[in-house]
Amino acid sequence: MTSFHTRRVEDRDSLIDFQSMLPPDIKIIAPTTYTRLNLLNYCQFLELFMQLRASGCRCEHGEILESKIRAVRQVISKIVETDTVFNGVKKN
């Protein structure tokens, strides 16, 4: 796959077309970009759950981690939303 930065905008399939930093095996579980983003979101949620379950009380660090996860979810949501609009305009 050609690097995202070296291709013209017209040649890119979508705004979320990027060179994968994941191992090739992950494509079996998550073949599309959207499923990879969902997998990332799920893994972050699982990590938080495991940390909170292990600790006896809620701490400031847990709240900071939760806020970071919320921020990542918002970014993922905006990427998908922008890509959807971009593809809609591209088709029309």
From Swiss-Prot:
Top-level taxon of origin: Viruses
GO-annotated biological processes: viral DNA genome packaging
InterPro entries listed in its UniProt record: Herpes_TT2 (IPR005208)
Cellular compartment(s): Host nucleus
GO cellular component: host cell nucleus
Record's keyword terms, sorted: Host nucleus, Viral genome packaging, Viral release from host cell
Family per similarity comment: Belongs to the herpesviridae TRM2 protein family.
Oligomeric form and interacting partners: Associates with TRM1 and TRM3 to form the tripartite terminase complex.
Function: Component of the molecular motor that translocates viral genomic DNA in empty capsid during DNA packaging. Forms a tripartite terminase complex together with TRM1 and TRM3 in the host cytoplasm. Once the complex reaches the host nucleus, it interacts with the capsid portal vertex. This portal forms a ring in which genomic DNA is translocated into the capsid.
The name this protein goes by in its record: Tripartite terminase subunit 2
